[in-house]
Amino acid sequence: MSTAMNFGSKSFQPRPPDKGSFPLDHFGECKSFKEKFMKCLRDNNFENALCRNESKEYLECRMERQLMAQEPLEKLGFGDLIDGKSDKN
């Protein structure tokens, strides 16, 4: 007796992400920014709100090197940091 089940001819069709791909940084072009961001997270008990500047710099690096799609910083939630303003005092 066969134990294989056939649920019809429908198969899973993968769908690309809405924002496009997020390629790996194989050449370490943004490694220093990533490490600075991760250090900030560790130093601040993983409270990401305290590391927004580091996060912004990391994403800017990725966009400049075509490692992610170009997006306005306002759309990524960094509108208040564009003019050098920061919640960190």
From Swiss-Prot:
Residues found modified as N-acetylserine: 2
Alphabetic keyword roster: Acetylation, Cytoplasm, Disulfide bond, Mitochondrion
Keyword check for Mitochondrion: yes
Function summary: Required for the transduction of an SCO1-dependent redox signal from the mitochondrion to ATP7A to regulate cellular copper homeostasis. May be required for the assembly of mitochondrial cytochrome c oxidase.
InterPro entries listed in its UniProt record: CHCH (IPR010625), COX19 (IPR051383), Cys_alpha_HP_mot_SF (IPR009069)
Family affiliation: Belongs to the COX19 family.
Compositionally biased spans, kind Polar residues: 1-12
Motif (Cx9C motif 2): 51-61
A Pfam family the protein falls into: CHCH
Disulfide bonds: 30-61, 40-51
Organism: Bos taurus (Bovine)
Motif (Cx9C motif 1): 30-40
CHCH domain span: 27-69
Gene (name only): COX19
GO cellular component, one term: mitochondrion
UniProt region (Disordered), positions on chain: 1-23
Protein name per Swiss-Prot or TrEMBL: Cytochrome c oxidase assembly protein COX19
